[in-house]
């Protein structure tokens, strides 16, 4: 299965519109898309769910352990052709000085290819 993280160099760079477009395009070809959103966002997942006709799940380093993130992700990609994870802010942005809560860290944890 193809698995991607949509990121950018900074916030407000069009990640959401690109993620929605990708999910909608893949879904239009009768493929199953598993959408995810990094962080505690509640609006973007609604758009991603609408575009893919699948529930979108949040992957949040602040409310979940790495193991919980991996388990939630793994359970929800089982019947998918493609997974799309929309990042938040920039690729290396986060609160932790070591970058352990960044989009880059999430892509490494879940072995996702990054679309920047």
Question: Where in the sequence are the language-model features?
Answer:
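ATP-dependent carboxylate-amine ligase catalytic core
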Residues: 2-17, 23-110
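Conserved beta-strand/loop subsegment of P-loop NTPase cores
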Residues: 111-116
């Amino acid at each position: 299965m193809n698995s991607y993280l949509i990121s950018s160099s900074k916030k407000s760079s069009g990640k959401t519109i690109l993620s929605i477009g990708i999910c909608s395009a893949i879904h239009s070809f009768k493929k199953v898309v598993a959408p995810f959103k990094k962080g505690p966002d509640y609006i973007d997942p609604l758009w991603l769910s609408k575009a893919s006709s699948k529930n979108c799940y949040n992957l949040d380093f602040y409310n979940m352990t790495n193991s919980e993130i991996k388990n939630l992700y793994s359970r929800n990609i089982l019947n998918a052709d493609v997974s799309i994870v929309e990042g938040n802010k920039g690729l290396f942005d986060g609160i932790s000085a070591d970058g352990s809560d960044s989009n880059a860290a999430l892509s490494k944890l879940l072995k996702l290819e990054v679309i920047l």
